[in-house]
Each structure stands twice: as structure tokens, then as C-alpha cells.
């Protein structure tokens, strides 16, 4: 099997390089690649890459993911998140390739308390990022490439690079008091979990093309940013890390205004994914604790 990966150096892309390698011949690209174009600001270039390589599977982990910055550069966000995805979808259809693509809970309005159902619940993005990702689903893949799998996910983290836990730990060493948002609900999902589930889904799809479609892929359970931070601090103290923090306050979203609106409810219903791919998605704490353990034992916090 020949697999083409876009966005190899991002949080998810890095884990995908590991998870996809056993499936066959992997060609992994990013914006700086020179042998083939992996630059999503060049739709014609990435489409030409697909036509030259003629892969069996394309995995797209490239995106404009700066949610707040997207508000001030909507055209650029649309170019990276939708226009180039459409170009890839058309080229993939020409060569008969599967396309695996990642989307977001931000396609929903973020209201209520019930996990969003894929395919039945109405979409209504709150921000530019959500609009561009919804466009990548509907106007690109669903329109131009039948052999696609779209994974909507949320609250993605990885041990590589910056993440929420590292930021909280840094602040907790510097300050005695912190205030963290407690009215946004979601499921922290590790890039490692996304990559492993993607590799499994590809193996299933190759043998059962009827699994093509839209899925929600997040870890189990539910938390808030405040409770997520509380877990991070609890695990840090268990590991013997000294924190200056002695008070953690819960505050509403309005306490931290941002250019892009954030949803109150980022919960996603994953029943369809678990049924079609015969997998169980572990509770969010499992992955976060694993990431923290690796962080505590391999680096100085």
C-alpha cells in the first residue's frame, strides 16, 4: 500500500508517521518538502503531488489551526483548509485514492449539553475556522471524492510541541493563583490515539469500502478546561514537582475574550466510529496521564 501524508510535522502528523509506517510505503510531506509539493497555499501544487505519486491512501493532517488568527485572515484559512482540500479530493478521485481528513467540533454551534451526532445534527460554525473546516467536508470531500473518511475531533494535544498541560504547568510554577475556564465542555484527545485509530480505519476501509463517510473521533468521558488543569496539577504533585500554585479558580468563558468565539459544548458522539471500526475509545484521562508521565520522566518541567 502506498500512503501519502500531508502535514507530517504537526502534532497529529508526527504521530501518523509512526502509526502509518507499518501499513506500507509512506511518503510524508510538509510545507517545506522539496521532492513534492506539500504546501497547502498552493492548491495546484498539492493536486499535482497526488497525480504524480498516485497513492492508494492520502492522509491529510495539514491545516490552518490558529483559530483566533483565522478571524483576521479568513481568505488564507479558506485556502489552506478548504480550497487545497478540494484540489486534493478531485485529484484523489482521478487516481482512485482514499482520502482521510480531519475536521472539528467547531462545525457545530456549541450549544446544549448532549454530544453532537455526525450526519444528523445541524452544523452552524461559530467562527471562521469552523466555517473553513465545514467547507472542507461538504464542498471538497463529500462532493468530489467518494472514497473518503472524515474524522471530526476536538481538544487535540500531543507530547510533542506546546500544549495546554505544559502551559498550565509553567504558569503553576510561576503563580500562586490561576483562573481557568469552567464552562466549556469537551474531551481531550491525544494525537497518538488519533493516529492509531486512523491506521486501523485505513486497514478496515481497504477491505470494506462501505465504511466511507463522516465520523466523530474523540476520547471518552467529558471535562472542562478547569478540571483538565486540576488533573494536570494533581499528577504533577504526585510526581514530586514543586508548584507555586495554591488556588485554582473556575471562571466563565467571558473572563478571557478571544477574537474567535469558542463553543460551550464540544462533546462528540462516537458510537458510529466505535461500531463500524470495532474499537473502544478510552477515557480522556488515560491519554493525558500517559502524556504527563512521559513529560515528567523525560524533560525538566
Swiss-Prot record:
The record marks 104 as: Could provide a fine-tuning to achieve optimal pKa matching between active site and substrate. It is an enzyme of class 1 (oxidoreductase). GO terms for molecular function: dTDP-4-dehydrorhamnose reductase activity; metal ion binding. It comes from the Bacteria. NADH binds at residues 10-12, 30, 39-40, 63-65, 129, 133. It holds the Pfam family RmlD_sub_bind. The active site is at residue 129. It catalyses: dTDP-beta-L-rhamnose + NADP(+) = dTDP-4-dehydro-beta-L-rhamnose + NADPH + H(+). Its cofactor is Mg(2+). Keywords: Carbohydrate metabolism, Lipopolysaccharide biosynthesis, Magnesium, Metal-binding, NAD, NADP, Oxidoreductase. InterPro entries: dTDP_dehydrorham_reduct (IPR005913), NAD(P)-bd_dom_sf (IPR036291), RmlD-like-bd (IPR029903). Its EC number is 1.1.1.133. GO terms for biological process: dTDP-rhamnose biosynthetic process; lipopolysaccharide biosynthetic process; O antigen biosynthetic process; polysaccharide biosynthetic process. The keyword Zinc does not apply. DTDP-beta-L-rhamnose binds at residues 104-105, 155. Pathway: Carbohydrate biosynthesis; dTDP-L-rhamnose biosynthesis; Bacterial outer membrane biogenesis; LPS O-antigen biosynthesis. Signal peptide: none annotated. Binds 1 Mg(2+) ion per monomer. Involved in the biosynthesis of the dTDP-L-rhamnose which is an important component of lipopolysaccharide (LPS). Catalyzes the reduction of dTDP-6-deoxy-L-lyxo-4-hexulose to yield dTDP-L-rhamnose. RmlD uses NADH and NADPH nearly equally well. Belongs to the dTDP-4-dehydrorhamnose reductase family. PANTHER family: DTDP-4-DEHYDRORHAMNOSE REDUCTASE, METHIONINE ADENOSYLTRANSFERASE 2 SUBUNIT BETA. This is dTDP-4-dehydrorhamnose reductase. It comes from Escherichia coli.
Amino acid at each position: 500500500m502506498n500512503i501519502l501524508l500531508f502535514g507530517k510535522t504537526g502534532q497529529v502528523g508526527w504521530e501518523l508517521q509512526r502509526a502509518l509506517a507499518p501499513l506500507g510505503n509512506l511518503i510524508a510531506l510538509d510545507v517545506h518538502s522539496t521532492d513534492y509539493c506539500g504546501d497547502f497555499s498552493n492548491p495546484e501544487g498539492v493536486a499535482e503531488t497526488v497525480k504524480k505519486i498516485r497513492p492508494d491512501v492520502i492522509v491529510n493532517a495539514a491545516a490552518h489551526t490558529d483559530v483566533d488568527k483565522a478571524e483576521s485572515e479568513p481568505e488564507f484559512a479558506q485556502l489552506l483548509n478548504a480550497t487545497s482540500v478540494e484540489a486534493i479530493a478531485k485529484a484523489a478521485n482521478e487516481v482512485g485514492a482514499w482520502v482521510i481528513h480531519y475536521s472539528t467540533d467547531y462545525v457545530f454551534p456549541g450549544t446544549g449539553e448532549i454530544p453532537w451526532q455526525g450526519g444528523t445534527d445541524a452544523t452552524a460554525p461559530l467562527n471562521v475556522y469552523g466555517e473553513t473546516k465545514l467547507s472542507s467536508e461538504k464542498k471538497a470531500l463529500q462532493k468530489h471524492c467518494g472514497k473518503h473518511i472524515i474524522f471530526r475531533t476536538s481538544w487535540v494535544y500531543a507530547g510533542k510541541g506546546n500544549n495546554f498541560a505544559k502551559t498550565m504547568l509553567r504558569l503553576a510554577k510561576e503563580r500562586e493563583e490561576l483562573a481557568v475556564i469552567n464552562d466549556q465542555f469537551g474531551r481531550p484527545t491525544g494525537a497518538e490515539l488519533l493516529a492509531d485509530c486512523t491506521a486501523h480505519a485505513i486497514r478496515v476501509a481497504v477491505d470494506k469500502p462501505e465504511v466511507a463517510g463522516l465520523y466523530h473521533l474523540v476520547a471518552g468521558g467529558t471535562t472542562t478546561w478547569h478540571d483538565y488543569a486540576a488533573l494536570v496539577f494533581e499528577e504533577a504533585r504526585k510526581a514530586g514537582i514543586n508548584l507555586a500554585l495554591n488556588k485554582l479558580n473556575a471562571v466563565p468563558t467571558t473572563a478571557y475574550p478571544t477574537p474567535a468565539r469558542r463553543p460551550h459544548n464540544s462533546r462528540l458522539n462516537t458510537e458510529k466510529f466505535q461500531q463500524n471500526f470495532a474499537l473502544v475509545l478510552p477515557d480522556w484521562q488515560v491519554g493525558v496521564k500517559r502524556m504527563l508521565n512521559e513529560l515528567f520522566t523525560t524533560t525538566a518541567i
